[in-house]
Design a protein with these regions (language model features):
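C-terminal motif of bacterial Sec signal peptides marking the signal peptidase cleavage site
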Residues: 21-22
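Short, well-ordered beta-strand elements
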Residues: 69-78, 151-156, 185-188, 220-222, ...
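N-terminal lobe/hinge region of extracytoplasmic solute-binding protein
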Residues: 73-146, 190, 261
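Gly/Pro-rich hinge or "lid" segments in bacterial periplasmic/extracellular proteins
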Residues: 105-110, 114-127, 194-196, 233-306, ...
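Aromatic- and charge-enriched surface segment that lines or borders ligand/interaction sites
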Residues: 130-131, 138-197, 221, 307, ...
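Surface-exposed binding/hinge segments that line
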Residues: 154-156, 178-179, 183-186, 191-248, ...
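Extracellular/periplasmic solute-recognition and catalytic clefts
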Residues: 198-199, 213-214, 269-280, 306-369, ...
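Structural transition elements
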Residues: 266, 398-442, 462-465
């Protein structure tokens, strides 16, 4: 039996956070900025099957050119619970190791001041095709057969891309740094669509029986019902990490961190549960810097990345303030005030949740015995929240009360419909009105005149937000 989680109800919540980046004194060498794994050029260098130990050098280096070396230290509030990439759709840990057929085009973001700045990559769910480029696929097309009611997607698999070779990893030695093949892609896409624990299997029932075949030496073809074509293009290209079949065959899955194997810019070197995750540079990474003074350089620039697991908010802030952490997201407005006073060398960026989900609360709609199955309960929970009050008290009047599915950002400007928009449905506008009396009435009609008890699983950064909401619901 499949388990499905639905994002709803308290998904139109306003969120604003800060990205704080540590800035070292001028006399101190700084850690080079990493080049994210988002290539644009189709060039695929031929790489050996054993790691090259020397870092690539350019004959002439201008003062502005990026330098090789250094380790970027980050912090997050939760530990990793799922290492198998098929069970994930996104995430920092996976994106450093594994890759998909499409990913974001780095040159269309800021790119250190050399990109087109069509996006700032703030949207975790950024799914605009115009902002994508080929990673493990370097060619693609899709066609429509209305007579058969069928859509066809064809991917050309990029030549010259090899699996990272970490001599200290048994799983990596098993793959032996071989070239990625069309068979690898077919295996991975089928696994994502048919394995009961895979993310795509759980959320996209319509893909469980699609036809995925190798149709050429480096060609993969997918046939789907025509109604599902657009979603299939997005999900199969940019929501399934490609994995080596032999690792899954030998170990059953890849949920042991020691079996992590990918084509990304880094390799998983070490993991200490509840403490840290350590990544080492993949010396055979296939891609090049696409833009700026480092254009053409082999990526990545960093020697490694270290992620500290720091559940306690005060500990994370202290690590950032003292320079033990180079960058951190999810800083609250209240904490940002103190950081500005006590750590003035920090750089900051304020951003609003750009996919409109804010701080989402997941509820089970496939369980009829739970209150959330009734739409009146879900509407009551929304109407019992004073969104404007939270905006003013918790966020200092800054930020948006976002309306699902997208907030007002330039990437999704055409899709945004605000509360004051004449096209915004009145029934939806009512959800943001803060009407606790109407909420009580709806609960009574749904059979819960005295309310009901439930529990939520939260991260430490969400506690303040939902503590306010909990008090509102209690009334």
């Amino acid at each position: 039996m499949s388990k499905k989680v639905f994002w709803l109800v308290v998904s139109g919540l306003m969120v604003i956070s800060l990205v704080m980046a540590a800035c070292a004194p001028a006399a101190t060498p700084t850690t080079p900025t990493p080049a994210p794994a988002t290539p644009t050029t189709p060039t695929a260098p031929t790489t050996p099957t054993t790691p090259a130990q020397e870092r690539p050098q350019k004959e002439a280096v201008s003062p502005e050119a990026p330098n090789y070396g250094g380790t970027l230290t980050l912090a997050q509030n939760t530990d990793v619970t799922l290492w198998d990439p098929s069970r994930n759709i996104t995430g920092l840990t996976m994106s450093l190791i594994q890759q998909e057929l499409f990913q974001g085009d780095w040159a269309k973001g800021p790119a250190g001041g050399y990109g087109t700045s069509e996006t700032d990559w703030g949207a975790a769910a950024n799914d605009l095709f115009d902002l994508k480029t080929g990673y493990l696929a370097n060619g693609w097309k899709w066609t429509v057969d209305e007579a058969k009611g069928q859509g066809t997607i064809i991917f050309q698999i990029r030549p010259g891309v090899r699996w990272a070779l970490n001599p200290k990893s048994e799983a990596s030695r098993l793959v032996a740094g071989r070239e990625v093949t069309a068979d690898d892609v077919v295996f991975s896409l089928k696994r994502g669509a048919t394995w009961e624990l895979a993310f795509i299997y759980g959320f996209y029932r319509e893909f469980r029986a699609v036809d995925i075949t190798k149709t050429g030496p480096r060609e993969v073809t997918i046939k789907v019902p025509l109604d599902n074509l657009v979603t299939a293009v997005s999900r199969f290209s940019n929501a399934i990490y490609i994995v080596p079949p032999e690792v899954v065959t030998k170990y059953g899955d890849m949920n042991n961190w020691r079996n992590a194997q990918g084509t990304g810019p880094f390799m998983l070197a070490d993991y200490v549960p509840a403490s840290q995750i350590v990544f080492a540079r993949n010396p055979n990474y296939w891609d090049r810097d696409p833009v700026g003074p480092g254009k053409g350089n082999q990526l990545p620039y960093l020697d490694g990345v270290r992620i500290l697991i720091l559940p306690d908010a005060s500990t994370r802030l202290a690590a950032l303030r003292t320079g033990k952490v180079d960058q951190m997201t999810g800083v609250s407005m209240e904490d940002s005030v103190q950081l500005r006073k006590n750590a003035q060398a920090l750089l900051e960026r304020i951003y609003v949740s750009t996919d409109g989900r804010g701080t989402p609360l997941a509820m089970r709609l496939d369980k009829p015995e739970l209150p959330f199955k009734d739409i009146r309960v879900r509407r009551a929970m929304m109407m019992a929240i004073d969104f404007q009050g939270i905006r003013n008290s918790l966020y200092g009047g800054v930020g948006q009360i976002v309306t699902f599915p997208y907030s007002s950002v330039k990437e999704y400007e055409r899709l945004y419909v605000g509360l004051d928009d004449p096209d915004f449905p009145e029934s939806a506008r009512e959800l943001y009105s803060y009407n606790p009396e109407k909420a009580k009435q709806l609960l009574k009609e749904a059979g819960y005149p005295n309310g009901f008890k439930t529990s939520m699983v939260l991260t430490s950064t969400e506690v303040d937000y939902y503590s306010i909401i909990k008090d509102m619901w209690a009334k």
